[in-house]
Amino acid sequence: NTLVGGGFLGLDNLSPVDRSHLPDGVRIEQADGTAWMAAYSMAMLILALVLASENPVYDDMVVKFLEQFILISDALDASGLFDEEDGFFYDRLIDAHGNRTPIKVQTLVGLIPILATGSVPLEQVSRPSALRKRFARRLDDAESGEGPILPVRGPGGTDRAVVALVRPEQALRSMQRVLDEDTFLSPHGLRSVSRRHVVPYTVPG
């Protein structure tokens, strides 16, 4: 389902559970691990765009990596890992019966999804015919300010496309936590774990 789980890929030492060694029948969906894979797709997309600007044979690679990124973005958006009440991304445990338990600990894990963002020339990302054919709705949505592709005016008046893993309102709410002295912001930088967890947290169940 393109959501990453199983530990190792993310910031395992910040979780109240051992993400690499879960109880039998329990699996985990990781906000940060999923974001790392989206960031990988974004990096490869940008490289493919550079190559395609010199040789159209690489257009297929542009399509491939944009498709991967959008699949991950859609999966994360539909997953429910973003808590609308708290305005934050949480990992989630799923047991053998399908019961879902969010790990409501605010750490850097929940901020990683907003880092999976890139900026490319809008004309360049729209140029390949295969891209226009397969992602016509996505590119049309960009013009109306919807979806993971958003148009912006870059330096020198150039039109660029910001391709982001999370929706703008999700990024804004997450950043509000970053700048809050009662959560992540400290006199010495950012905390790895929110100050709200001075009171110990226990995973339900």
Where are these regions (language model features)?
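Acidic, mature catalytic/reactive cores of soluble proteins
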Residues: 1-205
